[in-house]
């Protein structure tokens, strides 16, 4: 028994066994570089033509949506999802409430963002996309990058969403889930405004 008690402190002071050879730790910055490569890979695969195939739309329309999203600082994936839900990619779409075009802009909202948005410009695909995505970008900034709240405000109006939030109510009406679908986790807690 005395021998065991005396030997215990010596065992506790022994250094840990060396790592097995052949198991090298990743060099510093490895994971950051891997993430950057994965992002680049996703961007290469997310070109307008891949969206055209996925949504079965013309290459011209896919390029217009992709370019307008990039110009206005919106994640192209979110932009395509928004246009699909709003107009099903129909540039002449009109809602019963009076919303128009690919991004279903209300005339007053469109004019508040760009005063030239009147008449035929509301359904001009490039102008409608540009102003619709700028509006979404403004909402993303207003809601500190919260995509769910920005989409709800896009659908219901900023004043309604703000009022619900002030009153402690959840402004959810199902719209954000409809746009985000299975990709909702991708946007949770992360702003999509690209720099």
Q: What are these language model-derived features?
A:
Residues 13-14:
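Boundary of Sec targeting at the N-terminus
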């Amino acid at each position: 028994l005395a021998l065991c008690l005396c030997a215990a402190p010596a065992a506790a002071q022994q250094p840990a066994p060396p790592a097995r050879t052949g198991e090298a730790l990743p060099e510093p910055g490895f994971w950051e570089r891997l993430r950057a490569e994965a992002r680049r890979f996703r961007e290469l695969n997310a070109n307008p033509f891949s969206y055209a195939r996925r949504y079965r739309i013309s290459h011209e329309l896919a390029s217009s949506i992709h370019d307008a999203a990039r110009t206005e600082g919106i994640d192209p994936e979110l932009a395509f999802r928004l246009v699909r839900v709003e107009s099903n990619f129909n540039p002449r779409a009109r809602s019963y409430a009076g919303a128009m075009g690919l991004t279903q802009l209300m005339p007053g909202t469109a004019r508040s963002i760009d005063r030239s948005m009147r008449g035929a410009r509301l359904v001009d695909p490039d102008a409608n996309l540009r102003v619709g995505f700028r509006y979404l970008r403004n909402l993303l900034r207003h809601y500190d990058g919260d995509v769910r709240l920005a989409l709800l405000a896009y659908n219901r109006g900023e004043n309604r969403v703000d009022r619900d939030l002030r009153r402690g109510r959840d402004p959810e009406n199902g719209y954000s889930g409809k746009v985000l679908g299975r990709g909702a986790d991708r946007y949770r807690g992360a702003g999509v405004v690209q720099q």
